Amino acid sequence: MSLNFLDFEQPIAELEAKIDSLTAVSRQDEKLDINIDEEVHRLREKSVELTRKIFADLGAWQVAQLARHPQRPYTLDYVRLAFDEFDELAGDRAYADDKAIVGGIARLEGRPVMVIGHQKGRETKEKIRRNFGMPAPEGYRKALRLMEMAERFNMPIITFIDTPGAYPGVGAEERGQSEAIARNLREMSRLNVPIICTVIGEGGSGGALAIGVGDKVNMLQYSTYSVISPEGCASILWKSADKAPLAAEAMGIIAPRLKELKLIDSIIPEPLGGAHRNPEVMAASLKAQLLEDLADLDVLSTDDLKNRRYQRLMSYGYA
């Protein structure tokens, strides 16, 4: 897979382009007298060191760009890599099936679980079909239907959050967008089974929180979680989206800051360069964290689960 490099990764992109050129020349003419392999190896080591140096000092705006990376693994990628026997379930039994939310029953190391998450889509047609990962009310009602099903069958619930926000269209508002989100917040706080939520990309506002009330809340290293996008915040405060980098720093949208504020429990490390560089390794780390969280929650009573979850929800907004 050819990698897409972000603006701040251009020095890395230039090195990788040189490596690709040398590799192509080597393949075309195997009778070359010079030792290209040594040069390629040297450049690869230099690329790794440069990547390590750049990623050791990322700002909040750069992390926000990584969270939106077009090659970043989505919910269905993690379902494929970390779970077995996934059986997708569709529809809210009231209006429609919202493709921006996917969910179904799967097995995690043999244990039945309910997996629910946002799905953005990659190609243009799929992005449109998935509405760029922005759910309408029927998406959140589908998610709630699946969560209530999980409760009936005593299955843990695992959610993956990756959305710029709930869809703000007129139709969505007419069908009760705010009510659907509010109902999910209330009902998730009352469910009798363990809930583990993980932000895998963008955690945008109420659209993220509507499947984000859990007993454990994790974030991938280069994901974000905020009440508004940096561009939206900049447009309101400075009347210019160009101030988005400044807004990103001020908002505290990155995982270390949110863990410091006790809004999340764990930060799951990503491979060097981000999750898209090695989805298999990222999925293995995510799976290990989910299994660890389930083991911690299995020893708690139902009342303890609900009390802790409710207190977490009520603590949001307090310093």
Curated annotation (Swiss-Prot):
All copies of domain CoA carboxyltransferase C-terminal, residue ranges: 35-296
What does the similarity note say?
Belongs to the AccA family.
Function per UniProt: Component of the acetyl coenzyme A carboxylase (ACC) complex. First, biotin carboxylase catalyzes the carboxylation of biotin on its carrier protein (BCCP) and then the CO(2) group is transferred by the carboxyltransferase to acetyl-CoA to form malonyl-CoA.
What PANTHER family has UniProt attached to this entry?
A: ACETYL-COENZYME A CARBOXYLASE CARBOXYL TRANSFERASE SUBUNIT ALPHA (PTHR42853), ACETYL-COENZYME A CARBOXYLASE CARBOXYL TRANSFERASE SUBUNIT ALPHA, CHLOROPLASTIC (PTHR42853:SF3)
Q: Which domain of life is it from?
A: Bacteria
Name of the featured protein: Acetyl-coenzyme A carboxylase carboxyl transferase subunit alpha
Subunit composition and interactions: Acetyl-CoA carboxylase is a heterohexamer composed of biotin carboxyl carrier protein (AccB), biotin carboxylase (AccC) and two subunits each of ACCase subunit alpha (AccA) and ACCase subunit beta (AccD).
- EC number(s) stated in the UniProt entry for this protein: 2.1.3.15
Annotated Gene Ontology MF terms? acetyl-CoA carboxylase activity; ATP binding; carboxyl- or carbamoyltransferase activity
State the compartments where it is located: Cytoplasm
Source organism per UniProt:
Salmonella arizonae (strain ATCC BAA-731 / CDC346-86 / RSK2980)
Q: What GO CC annotations are associated with the protein? A: acetyl-CoA carboxylase complex
Enumerate the HAMAP family for this protein: AcetylCoA_CT_alpha
The record's SUPFAM superfamilies line, in alphabetical order, gives: ClpP/crotonase
Q: Which reaction does it catalyse?
A: N(6)-carboxybiotinyl-L-lysyl-[protein] + acetyl-CoA = N(6)-biotinyl-L-lysyl-[protein] + malonyl-CoA
Provide this UniProt record's keywords sorted from A to Z. ATP-binding, Cytoplasm, Fatty acid biosynthesis, Fatty acid metabolism, Lipid biosynthesis, Lipid metabolism, Nucleotide-binding, Transferase
Q: What class of enzyme is it?
A: transferase
Q: Name its pathway.
A: Lipid metabolism; malonyl-CoA biosynthesis; malonyl-CoA from acetyl-CoA: step 1/1
> What biological processes does GO assign it?
fatty acid biosynthetic process; malonyl-CoA biosynthetic process
